Every structure is written in structure tokens, then in C-alpha cells.
Amino acid sequence: MQEIQKNTKKEQYNLNKLQKRLRRNVGEAIADFNMIEEGDRIMVCLSGGKDSYTMLEILRNLQQSAPINFSLVAVNLDQKQPGFPEHILPAYLEQLGVEYKIVEENTYGIVKEKIPEGKTTCSLCSRLRRGILYRTATELGATKIALGHHRDDILQTLFLNMFYGGKMKGMPPKLMSDDGKHIVIRPLAYCREKDIVRFAEAKAFPIIPCNLCGSQPNLQRQVIADMLRDWDKRYPGRIETMFSAMQNVVPSHLCDTNLFDFKGITHGSEVIDGGDLAFDREEIPLQPAGWQPEEDDTALEALRLDVIEVK
């Protein structure tokens, strides 16, 4: 009995510690990118996956102690997939007392009609959902649209664009929507997927699997995700350093003439960002810069990604 109580206390301690870390990560992202302002009405896109559940939970937690006032409204898109448990989210949100709206649109039927069997449905599904979410935000009077992408999603997108798109483009923590009417935010931008997985398990969120896109094997994003997880396991700190690199871009040492005026460099120009390393080997630290392992770090098994593709 004492052993059980001891384990329970330890589990609660670890959960509190994990929640504080996630809350700190979300708070820092909100502050760094000015994601939430006084009087904002945040439309929290809730898919029924671990990421969006975690986002809603942390935002609700921050709402209670934030120095500003903002409101939350959870929105779920019921895409009419066969077997979708439509009762789960309403029951969960009513229990929490969270304002919500379930939007019913048969995007599943459209995707199955337009996309040949065996082909990737993500692109079309993403475009359809994006339009519906923008429309719903307008109807609800939302000032911000919150999506549940985390740090690992952002890095995966960067590598996807480098490997397959030939460009260095990630997934911004905050952006203006392509219709120019909505601000999209990603409060989990600084959060590690492994932390979200553990938090979702500890909180026992009623996870709803995605039978439309999650069942498709060999997606390019999944290949990148597996690669990054392998790196994280074999080279601790590498993921943190790569994400830090996205926040420390040096245009003068890349090759994009739109970002830096290379043609304008002439005799007498000032030395920029350390100058030339062509004749000197740059000293690279043996350990990732600024990285400190967490006490409860564990390797994360390969999981289906729970994301709403709005880029």
C-alpha cells in the first residue's frame, strides 16, 4: 500500500513538473511572437489528437493567471469519416465547461472522390479544412486561430522543404492567413513532441485517431519524423540545436540574393557577421549549444503525427 502511494506521489510530481515545462514553453512562445493580446477571442482547433488536447489544456491553464483577458472557443471539424466517434468531443468539452462548436462538413467524401486510391490525401484535405476553418473563425468572431503544431512539426517542415522543395522554409509560429483576414498562431511552437505524448498519456485525453490520413503509410513527413527521432535518440541535443538555428539565421552566409545584397560588396565594405571562413576552420562545439538534458528525458517511439496542415 505504501509502495502504491509512493508511486502515485511520484507520478503526480512528474506530471506537475511536465505541465510546468509545457506551460513555460507556451508562455515563452506567446510572449516572443505576441500571439495573444488583450481581448482576443482564440479559436482553438481541436482535432481530437494529443497535440490539440494539450494546447487547449495549457491555454486554459494560462488563461487563469494571465495578466490579460482573452477567451477560448474550441472548434472541431467533423469530416464524416466512417466510424468517427462524434460524441466524444462534445462530452469532453461540456465536462470542462469550454465553449465549443462542431462543424460538420463531408470533406472525407470529397477527398475520396477526387484522390485515386493509394494516393496521398493530405494536400487536398488540408486545403479543404483550411477554408472551412477560416470561414468558421469569421462566423465566431475569432481574432486568432490556434493550431496544435509543436517544435518537431516545425523542424519536420523545414527538412521537408529542404529535401523535396529546394527551399529553406519552416512552419511559422505566427502568420497571416492566405486570405489576409485571419492571424494563425501555434502556441506549442517551443514544445517537444515527447513532452506532449507523456502529458497526453498522463491526462488520459480521449484520443480520436485519424482514419483518413493517419492510415497512409510511407508519407514523406513520416520519413522525416522517423529520421529526427532517430537523431534525437542517438545524438541528444541535436534537435534543440537545430531549432535554435531557425532562430539564428545569418543571411550574409547563405546564398539567397533576395535576403542579402552580395552584389553590393565591394573593396572597402565592412566585415559582416564574422567575415570569411574560407581560410579558417570554424570551431564547432562538441556539445550542442545551450542544451541541458531533462531528468525525465526518454526516447519517443514512432507515432502517427497529429497535425492540421495549415502552412
UniProtKB/Swiss-Prot annotation:
Short motif (PP-loop motif): ranges: 47-52
This protein's encoding gene: ttcA
Organism of derivation: Salmonella typhi
Disulphide linkage map: none
Chief place of localization: cytoplasm
Binding site for [4Fe-4S] cluster: 122, 125, 213
HAMAP family linked to this entry: TtcA
A Pfam family that the UniProt record links to this protein: ATP_bind_3
Its EC number(s): 2.8.1.-
Phylogenetic lineage: Bacteria, Pseudomonadati, Pseudomonadota, Gammaproteobacteria, Enterobacterales
Keyword RNA-binding: yes
Alphabetized UniProt keyword annotations: 4Fe-4S, ATP-binding, Cytoplasm, Iron, Iron-sulfur, Magnesium, Metal-binding, Nucleotide-binding, RNA-binding, Transferase, tRNA processing, tRNA-binding
Protein name: tRNA-cytidine(32) 2-sulfurtransferase
Membrane-crossing segments per the record: none
Family as reported in the entry's similarity comment: Belongs to the TtcA family.
PANTHER family recorded: AMINOTRAN_5 DOMAIN-CONTAINING PROTEIN (PTHR43686:SF1), SULFURTRANSFERASE-RELATED (PTHR43686)
Cofactor(s) needed: Mg(2+); [4Fe-4S] cluster
